[in-house]
């Protein structure tokens, strides 16, 4: 009865009376207006934004991410001939603490291309990478070995696990992130296949930040810089510098986490394969 009375007072429901049958409000307890009750009903506190944000942070499965953004050989305004496949020339990765927003470790190596050893003028202008820089770089195979050692040390130091590496925590608490699926799904996969390089299995699953960005913000950015600008961030460094792109991707991830976005693996090339933790740790 109390709920019905309150609903009437708030104008949510109406009672229709036959002519002459309407009671005197002064004598009808259900029709009498109790200001204290309405005030009390309107003052029931909703969950604060802070509490909702804390709850979503608690639901976030990853406390760390590894942001990767390869730079590769490229040519202007034309598809390269069949023998001109894109080769990685910059291999950057940054380990980002999503709780603090800080970059805690970096991996950065320039890679020597073998299939197209001479960089195009367009590639140099776009990436800022000079010919002498890649000439003194290392083969991709060597860089992957060095990266695996770096990854092992950083994960051990923080007790981190990647997705599918631990049966008791299949999600892990750290994941690779990229902007689109190109870096791992196309560039690295194709080059390793062509050159017979053993690609670590942990490169087979990652988070495409662009996919989650589009879903969360209901906005389709025209490029990465536009994505940053739309959420109030400015690109820091040089665009198409792999290490700068990776750092800005980490900053965007932290912003999205603060805004309440939840992240999960968006791409898994080997969905039924579990990682061998000994290969990483």
Curated annotation (Swiss-Prot):
Belongs to the ERI2 family. Its main location: cytoplasm. It is an enzyme of class 3 (hydrolase). It comes from Drosophila melanogaster. Its EC number is 3.1.15.-. Gene3D superfamilies: Ribonuclease H-like superfamily/Ribonuclease H (3.30.420.10). Optimum temperature is 37 degrees Celsius. This is 3'-5' exonuclease Snipper. The gene is Snp. Residues 19-52 are annotated as: Disordered. Residues 64-262 form the Exonuclease domain. Its cofactor is Mg(2+). Pfam families: RNase_T. One of its GO terms (molecular function) is nucleic acid binding. It is found in: Cytoplasm; Nucleus; Nucleus, Nucleolus.
């Amino acid at each position: 009865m109390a709920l019905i009375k309150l609903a009437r007072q708030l104008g949510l429901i109406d009672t229709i009376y036959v002519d002459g049958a309407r009671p005197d409000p002064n004598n009808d307890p259900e029709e009498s207006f109790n200001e204290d009750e309405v005030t009390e009903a309107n003052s029931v506190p909703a969950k604060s934004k802070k509490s909702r944000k804390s709850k979503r942070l608690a639901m976030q499965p990853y406390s760390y991410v590894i942001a990767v953004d390869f730079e590769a050989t490229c040519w202007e305004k034309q598809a390269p001939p069949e023998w001109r496949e894109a080769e990685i020339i910059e291999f950057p990765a940054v380990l980002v603490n999503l709780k603090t927003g800080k970059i805690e470790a970096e991996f950065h190596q320039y890679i020597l291309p073998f299939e197209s050893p001479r960089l195009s003028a367009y590639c140099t202008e776009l990436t800022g990478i000079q010919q002498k820089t890649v000439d003194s770089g290392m083969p991709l195979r060597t860089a992957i070995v060095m990266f695996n050692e770096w990854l092992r040390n950083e994960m051990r130091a923080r007790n981190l696990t990647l997705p599918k590496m631990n049966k008791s925590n299949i999600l892990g608490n750290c994941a690779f992130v990229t902007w689109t699926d190109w870096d791992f799904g196309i560039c690295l996969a194709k080059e390793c296949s062509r050159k017979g390089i053993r690609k670590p299995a942990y490169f087979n699953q990652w988070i495409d930040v662009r996919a989650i960005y589009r879903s969360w913000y209901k906005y389709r950015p025209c490029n990465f810089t536009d994505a940053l600008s739309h959420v109030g961030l400015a690109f820091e460094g040089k665009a198409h510098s792999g290490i700068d792109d990776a750092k800005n991707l980490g900053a965007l991830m932290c912003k999205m986490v603060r805004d309440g976005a939840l992240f999960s693996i968006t791409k898994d090339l080997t969905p039924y394969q579990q990682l061998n933790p000994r290969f990483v740790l």
